Structure formats: structure tokens, C-alpha cells
Amino acid sequence: MGLSDGEWQLVLNVWGKVEADLAGHGQEVLIRLFKGHPETLEKFDKFKHLKSEDEMKGSEDLKKHGNTVLTALGGILKKKGKHEAELKPLAQSHATKHKIPIKYLEFISEAIIQVLQSKHPGDFGADAQGAMKRALELFRNDIAAKYKELGFQG
């Protein structure tokens, strides 16, 4: 089920704060992901060697990838659920090339919520958190459907 116009507005309001520093937010999201779920680091050849949080914070490649991830996610969120065109190539690459399980998308969704809670507590109250969780769940469900079409059991 989709989000209401009001819920999308809550999502996009806080996303405006994220866009002020995509690379910084993205880096923090990836660090939380890798610290909370170290197994996810194995999917990233560029980052496998980063063992400590300090090493991760010092990595320009990690910062760049964080920017890439959140730029793509922002483009999807702005479509308010009508994200078929944006989702298809993302699902294709994540299923066939990177082989990223849906579970890992759940993990990064959790990390996104945590980063938004810590960086924007005034703009990310219970209603906004609920809306963002639903938006990310919609994204994951749609990616999972694409994975299935592609024959990937992620």
C-alpha cells in the first residue's frame, strides 16, 4: 500500500535536510551499516579492507559511494512510489552484478532511519519516522518483486 500525500511530504521534508550533505549522510549510513552488520562489508571490494570506524571515516571512496547511494534513493523517493523507471536498472545491477540480498536493503534502511534520528531529531519525529519506514519498505518490496522477475532469490 502506498503512502498518503501527507506522508510523502514528511519524507521529502526530511530528505531536503539530507540533500544539504548527501556525502556526509551517505558515509554515516554506510558506516552504521558496516558496523551493525559486518557481513555486508564483504559485498564491497573497495571497502573490505576498512576495518575500523576511523578508517571508514577517512575513506573518500566510502564517502563517494554514500553520496551515490543516497542520490539514487533520493531520486526514487521524489517519485512518490511511481519509481518503476528508476528502480529497474537499480534492481538489475543489485541482483545480477552485485548480488545484494533484500535483507541487506533492510539493514541499510535501518541505518538510514538511525542516521536521520541522530542528525535531524527536530525534523524526524514519530510521524516522519513512520512515513520514512513505509517509503523504504515500499522501495524494498518493489525491488524484491524485480529481483523475482530476474530470477534472483535475494
Curated annotation (Swiss-Prot):
InterPro entries xrefs: Globin (IPR000971), Globin-like_sf (IPR009050), Myoglobin (IPR002335)
Modification sites for Phosphothreonine: T68
Residues reported in the UniProt entry to bind heme b: H94
Subcellular localization(s) per the UniProt record: Cytoplasm, Sarcoplasm
GO biological process, one term: removal of superoxide radicals
One Pfam family of this chain: Globin
GO cellular component: extracellular exosome; sarcoplasm
Domain of life: Eukaryota
Disulfide bond annotation, renumbered to this chain: none
Record-listed Phosphoserine modification sites: S4
Chief localisation class: cytoplasm
Residues of the Globin domain: 2-148
SUPFAM superfamilies: Globin-like (SSF46458)
Entry binding sites for O2: H65
Membrane spanning stretches: none
Catalytically driven reaction(s): Fe(III)-heme b-[protein] + nitric oxide + H2O = Fe(II)-heme b-[protein] + nitrite + 2 H(+); H2O2 + AH2 = A + 2 H2O
Keywords associated with the record: Cytoplasm, Heme, Iron, Metal-binding, Muscle protein, Oxidoreductase, Oxygen transport, Phosphoprotein, Transport
One GO molecular-function entry: metal ion binding
EC identifiers of the protein: 1.7.-.-, 1.11.1.-
Annotated nitrite binding sites: H65
Family: Belongs to the globin family.
Role description: Monomeric heme protein which primary function is to store oxygen and facilitate its diffusion within muscle tissues. Reversibly binds oxygen through a pentacoordinated heme iron and enables its timely and efficient release as needed during periods of heightened demand. Depending on the oxidative conditions of tissues and cells, and in addition to its ability to bind oxygen, it also has a nitrite reductase activity whereby it regulates the production of bioactive nitric oxide.
PANTHER family from the UniProt entry: MYOGLOBIN
Subunit text: Monomeric.
UniProt name for this protein: Myoglobin
Native source species: Lutra lutra (European river otter)
